[in-house]
Amino acid sequence: MTNDKADFTQGNILKKLVAFMMPILGALILQAAYGAVDLLVVGRFGSTSGLSAVSTGSQVLNLVTFVVIQFAMGITVLIARYLGEKRPERIGAVIGGGAVVFTMMSVALFIAMVGFARPISVLMQAPAEAVDLTASYVRICGAGIFFIVAYNLLSAIFRGLGDSKSPLLFVLVACIVNIIGDLVLVAGLHMDAAGAAIATVTAQALSVVFAVMLLLKKDLPFAITKKDFRLNPQCRKFLKIGLPLALQEFLTQISFLALCAFVNRLGLEASSGYGVACKIVNFAMLVPSSLMQSMASFVSQNIGAGKKKRAKQSMFTGIGVGLAVGCVVFVLVLFKGDVLCSVFSTDAAVIQNGFAYLKGFAPETLVTAILFSMVGYFNGNNKTVWVMTQGLIQTLLVRLPLAYFMSIQPNASLTKIGLAAPVATTVGIFLNIGFFIYLNRAEQSKSILS
């Protein structure tokens, strides 16, 4: 059974949603800081080539990480659904099956990232001066991919159980270890991009050990047995939810990798500036991202308990919270982007290029507040095929073509390339509004017939 704090089917929606969201936001802030520290330390104590390598290599790592997170969303939603339905005895098989599936995924990613690190770097159009360092960064992160996958799986399990505080502790451990590692390996031993990658993998490994220990000590409302660790029927259920999300996220991240490649064609300073801007973008997207993740568990529990109206109300509450914060972030990014960029680099050209991208990207901080809450609602409502569909439309028909078009213009600029993101997101909002109206009408028709 869920305790009162983890029971989202009753009580004030705003208070419950914010209380559940805040630890997720805290974890995402630490994760963003975790990634930013690599760029910050390399930018201060490494080379410009090393900065470009971390920028480009982290785009590859982000692709893998975000796809894994969306894959794991299937586990989060299914666990929350079983809690809402008061059937916790099924959760052990979900966790055991998830461990097997994600281990298989780790092996495949290990082979791809370690064996093809250099071709990946070339495909990303890393500047010639930074290809070797980029390949080294990707290869080292690939060698430790098991820990990165395991961390995200464990976090998904805890969130499905209504516990958003434990993942915050996991990432806190990782962040502290990563900072120490960067200072020792990059600032102290001058290992440049390779040192940043080693620090990242070491930090993730220690956080996984901590997470496993915490899960074993947790008072769970179900049992996990050896027979659960196999490809069982629950695998098909969480894959049905997670696969569409993972595919959609994969193609979305591919579009951002392509965007990175478009920018790399503009030169080393543009590449480094874009990398700095992306770290700021990561921070700007934290509240919408935390709302989306918390919304999935919140909605899934209420759908499982038969409280569809409450599930819809939670979506609108999330949009309101996101817009309130988004207005503040929009002003900071649009008018103080150069100050934000100067935190990560002292190079005037890098700062100028980073700020140029942020000017075009700025409206994204507002429209994403709406889109992500809607996507979180549909994820929790098991409409992940739709989430995939609308995501693919945004990526393949809007964001990628528009960014490419902007990049090949004679007067190409990072500001114009940055506009591709908010334009695509706006299209996504209209698509989701239409689908929401369609579902409501279908639900009303079904109610009348019954």
Predicted regions and their residues:
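Short runs within selected transmembrane alpha-helices of multi-pass transporters and secretion channels
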Residues: 72, 141-159, 167-175, 196-209, ...
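Transmembrane alpha-helix boundary and packing residues in multipass membrane permease domains
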Residues: 24, 28, 40, 77, ...
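N-terminal transmembrane alpha-helices
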Residues: 8-40, 44-45, 59-74, 78, ...
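Helix-terminus/linker motif at the lipid-water interface of multi-pass membrane proteins
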Residues: 29, 33-52, 121-128, 184-191, ...
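Transmembrane helical elements of multi-pass membrane transporters/channels
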Residues: 19-38, 140, 174, 203-207, ...
